[in-house]
From Swiss-Prot:
It comes from Sclerotinia sclerotiorum (strain ATCC 18683 / 1980 / Ss-1). PANTHER family: HSPC111 PROTEIN-RELATED, NUCLEOLAR PROTEIN 16. This is Nucleolar protein 16. Residues 8-23 have a biased composition (Basic residues). Residues 124-144 have a biased composition (Acidic residues). Its main location: nucleus. Residues 1-23, 62-177, 196-226 are annotated as: Disordered.
Length: 226
């Protein structure tokens, strides 16, 4: 019988409703600095490019928005380290010295320029790595300026500030539970552990001792009935 009902449901014309998971929705306005400089008329990629940020670290695989003709953004740091997968269509000619055998005239070897070739335009295989005493000084812009975007500076300063760590406070129910334990067993923490009625969650001796000490430091004491 159950199988027939299942077949009937599968043949039904009523479409199954699937809810979109809210956990996958990204809130780009969670940061106050980004929210203050956000433009609603622009897309997420356009806003990130203008703010000097990037939404992904991998190289672009397709579906890139075509930019208008003109100078590129000087504050964007997106895809600066992405390695291009395309091979240049035209290679510039280079000069080299040829050594020949003085007797036969055959080419013995070809000596190229000391400049290291980089046909794939790999930024990790550039001349800057061969120089001595040179370090990474940031992305900069096309004009060679090392000045960073002000928004990026504000975000870096915000990230460098360590957040204040708040100590966990004991709830009223936890205080009442500790008070009942201390009222019954005093300082006998071993008996507190073995008490199945007052310790149903089987807290360890060290855990109960730490909670009791914290409760006493906060001014907790056993109340006596008159």
């Amino acid at each position: 019988m159950g199988r027939e009902l299942q077949k009937k449901k599968n043949r039904s014309g009523n479409a199954k409703i699937k809810l979109k998971p809210k956990s996958k929705r990204v809130n780009p306005l969670g940061n106050a600095i980004i929210a203050a400089n956000w433009r609603q008329e622009e897309t997420l990629t356009q806003n990130y490019r203008r703010l000097g940020l990037t939404s992904r670290l991998n190289t672009v695989t397709g579906g890139i928005e075509k930019k208008k003709a003109g100078p590129e953004s000087k504050t964007s740091t997106a895809n600066k380290l992405a390695i291009s997968n395309t091979i240049p269509k035209s290679l510039a000619p280079t000069e080299a010295r040829v050594e020949r055998d003085p007797e036969t005239g055959k080419i013995i070897r070809v000596i190229h320029d000391e400049k290291k070739t980089n046909p794939l335009n790999d930024p990790l295989d550039s001349e800057a790595e061969d120089g001595e005493g040179e370090g990474f000084e940031g992305f900069g812009d096309e004009e060679g300026s090392a000045s960073k975007n002000e928004i990026v500076k504000m975000l870096e300063e915000q990230a460098s500030r360590a957040g204040e760590k708040r100590e966990r406070q004991q709830s009223e129910r936890e205080k009442e539970w500790i008070e009942r334990l201390v009222k019954r067993w005093g300082e006998n923490y071993g008996a507190m552990v073995r008490d199945r009625r007052l310790n149903p969650m089987q807290q360890t001796e060290s855990d109960i001792k730490r909670r009791v000490q914290k409760w006493k430091d906060a001014g907790g004491s056993v109340t006596t009935e008159a």
